[in-house]
């Protein structure tokens, strides 16, 4: 199966339309491919100081970010929130320090399909569902939704064939996209308030809801990008 790990160039171009010269732009967790429009960076690796200027070390799950309220015009966070034990501290801090921003996480489609992560090792017979180090399913239905990814998902009966076809058909379905202004709207689906137990029908239905919502809203995001591109050409 074709994999889309690197940022999609068209998404970069789209985000560039919201960023003008002179803006202060913060990237969270820059990794090996820093956001080209970023002027400031923060992350949990102290070693990044050597490669990036304006870099500060932050524990996203618990720290207050070392910036003033609404200091930044734009904040960019790609493949960060799903890795955190407490992404909600990070969300609140992004809303506090920035006026607008963009969040990208792996989509629920990738998190339920086997071979999304350890596909490179052909000798390894067992393939995890999605990425085994991720703590949350994340999807957009007008707000960001977070559902804890329990190990029981490996044993659930999920027909992934249709989901794989979606991933093969359109590279955009590999990710969840969320563009925001003023503050980030989100919902944490919690046990036992929103589902009785991990692995039961309510939990499974939330996963299916996340997958279906992701397909719809990713399609809308792509249409918005294409519309803006056609209006400017």
Name what the model sees in each region.
Residues 1-19:
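Class I SAM-dependent methyltransferase Rossmann-like catalytic core
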């Amino acid at each position: 199966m074709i994999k889309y790990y690197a940022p999609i160039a068209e998404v970069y171009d789209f985000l560039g339309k919201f960023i003008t010269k002179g803006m202060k732009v913060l990237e969270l967790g820059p990794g090996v491919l820093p956001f080209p429009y970023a002027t400031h960076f923060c992350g949990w690796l102290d070693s990044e100081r050597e490669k990036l200027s304006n870099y500060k070390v932050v524990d996203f799950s618990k720290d207050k970010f070392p910036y003033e309220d609404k200091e930044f015009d734009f904040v960019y966070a790609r493949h960060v929130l799903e890795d955190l034990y407490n992404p909600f501290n990070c969300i609140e801090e992004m809303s506090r320090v920035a006026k607008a921003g963009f969040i990208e996480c792996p989509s629920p489609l990738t998190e339920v399909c086997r071979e999304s992560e350890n596909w490179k090792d052909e000798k390894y017979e067992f393939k995890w569902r999605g990425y085994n180090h991720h703590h949350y399913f994340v999807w957009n239905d007008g707000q960001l939704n977070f559902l804890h990814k329990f190990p029981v998902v490996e044993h659930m009966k999920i027909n992934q064939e249709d989901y794989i076809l979606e991933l093969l058909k359109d590279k955009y379905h590999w990710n969840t996209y969320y563009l925001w202004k003023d503050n980030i709207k989100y919902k944490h689906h919690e046990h036992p308030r929103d589902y009785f137990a991990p692995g039961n029908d309510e939990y499974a239905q939330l996963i299916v809801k996340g997958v279906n919502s992701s397909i719809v809203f990713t399609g809308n995001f792509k249409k918005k990008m294409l519309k803006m591109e056609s209006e400017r050409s």
